Every structure is written in C-alpha cells, then in structure tokens.
Amino acid sequence: MKAFVSGVALCGAAYLAVIATPKADQLHYAATLTGAAETPPTDSKGSGSVIASYDTDTKKLQWTIYYSDLTGPAIAAHFHGPAPVGKPAPIEVPLEPPLDSPLFGSATLTDAQAKDLADGMMYFNIHTAEHKQGEIRGQMQGAM
C-alpha cells in the first residue's frame, strides 16, 4: 500500500510539474503595405500584407508576405526599427533573395528587436529600382 501511495504521489508531482511549466507564447503581428505609408510617401499602386508570428521561447519570427502591382521587381525587402509610423530606421532583419511574392521566412530576433516588434516600433518595406528608398511600407502591429 505504501508503494502505491508513493507511486500516486510521484505521478501527481510529475503532472503538476508539467502543467506548471511555462509555455511559450505565440504572438501574432500584421502590417498592410502601401506607398502612402512609405517614408517619404510614394505614388505607387503597389500593395501588400505581412502576417507574422513570434515565439517567445525560441525568439523566432516567422512571416508570410504578399505583394502586387509594384513598379518593377523587388530589389530589397527588410524589417526596420525602432521607428514610429512615418519615421525611418535602420534595417533590423534583411530578407534574402529571391524576393518574389509570396515571401516566406524566419529569423531569430534579439531581445531589443522583439521589444521593437511588441512596442509597434518595427516596420516592413519593399524596395524597387524606381523607389530605391522603399516603394511600399507597413508598420507591424499586434494581431489576433
């Protein structure tokens, strides 16, 4: 009987340890890409969207980016920060070619980059030959 009680106690302790272990959060973000949001604004008819998730345990940001109607092929695409809407900022996460839509990728963020993302201080933009400073841009915002 003593062994049975010890076994039950051990199983109970193991169960509590498992349910008490903190789980990573999956945080979701999105951005709408337009020429009007670029800095300085462009008259581009291009548009796009960014859908991203951030794993707080692995610190990995994963994204899917769609865009269309740019003035030419994308020559560069990046996440920038820290910057509020309408302000420029350095590149934080560059995307590697090919840059054809849709773009799928991931990167491990530093703690500072994760804070920029969480605080709405990160944006994504796409550059073309006609708009070397950026053709379309969107500020990353928390999403459900």
Give a label for each model feature:
Residues 15-77, 81-144:
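Metal-centered catalytic cores of metalloenzymes
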Residues 1-9:
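Bacterial N-terminal signal peptides that target proteins for export
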